[in-house]
Design a protein with these regions (language model features):
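N-terminal cap/lid segment of alpha/beta-hydrolase-fold proteins
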Residues: 39-67
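Conserved acidic catalytic loop of the alpha/beta-hydrolase fold
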Residues: 133-151
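Bacterial N-terminal signal peptides
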Residues: 17-30
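Short beta-strand element of the alpha/beta-hydrolase
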Residues: 70-79
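Short substrate-entry loop that stabilizes the transition state in hydrolases
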Residues: 80-91
Length: 237
């Protein structure tokens, strides 16, 4: 009898634990939904700032909630495939820049020389990682000058983890926190590059999405609208 009662008590405790976890999950989903709606209703201000390095005009942009002057500055460093437009996919809740801005950051993005809205470079084999790291340093210096802050946060993705790491290693006095996501852990490989990266194509842009066995984009996983946004902006290499 005692053993049976103990077993029953254990089952009840397990059931109560599951119910509690379910309530927490539902509450979290409700909070996330409310926050997403609030983010969608938020107005943002986008400003561009003139920046030049080595005679090349660089695109530098600041995004923040309209009417605010955030103290926290964060610089987003893009990867090899796309320019900085990848951080502000203005569709549903896909914009990382707007997500961070809604949480109190002044969000800065820039295009490495030859990318996006920065000036084209004559040598398509440039910029390499070292060159791009100094572009990031130039952007950071301008951000600190404009904002009046002494340090900023840096977030780099993919190849941006390489360039932002090199920038931070050379200029640690500028940086408060460094975040690396989807890092390149083994370098860029030993493959010989024979064609300069002067232009991106829709096919190259599509290559970053999940595909089926026959190589087609898997729209059961990927939102078609997001694919359309990226492919329509692939010229911004």
């Amino acid at each position: 009898m005692i053993r049976g009662a103990d077993t029953g008590g254990t089952m009840i405790r397990s059931l109560l634990s599951c119910l509690l976890m379910l309530q927490v999950l539902l509450f979290s989903l409700q909070v996330a939904t409310v926050q997403a709606r609030a983010d969608a209703a938020t107005e943002y201000q986008i400003q561009t700032f003139p920046l030049e390095r080595n005679g090349v005009a660089l695109h530098l942009q600041r995004l923040a909630v309209a009417g605010t002057q955030p103290q926290r500055q964060i610089l987003l460093v893009h990867g090899l495939t796309y320019s900085s437009h990848e951080f502000d996919v203005n569709y549903a809740d896909y914009s990382l820049a707007r997500y961070l801005a809604a949480r109190g950051f002044a969000v800065w993005t820039f295009d490495v020389a030859g990318y996006g809205e920065s000036q084209e470079v004559e040598d398509g084999f440039m910029p390499n990682s070292d060159y791009a790291a100094e572009d990031a340093a130039a952007a950071a210096a301008e951000i600190l000058k404009v904002s009046g802050q002494k340090k900023l946060d840096v977030l780099g993705g993919s190849w941006g983890t390489v360039t932002s790491s090199r920038f931070v290693a050379r200029h640690p006095e500028m940086v408060k926190k460094l975040v690396l996501y989807a890092p390149i852990m083994v370098g860029l490989g030993a493959a010989e590059v024979k064609v300069p990266f002067n232009h991106n194509t829709w096919l190259h842009a599509a290559g970053d999405f999940q595909t089926t066995k026959d190589g087609a984009i898997d729209y059961t996983i990927v939102d078609p609208q997001v694919v359309a946004v990226f492919q329509s902006n692939c010229w911004r290499y």
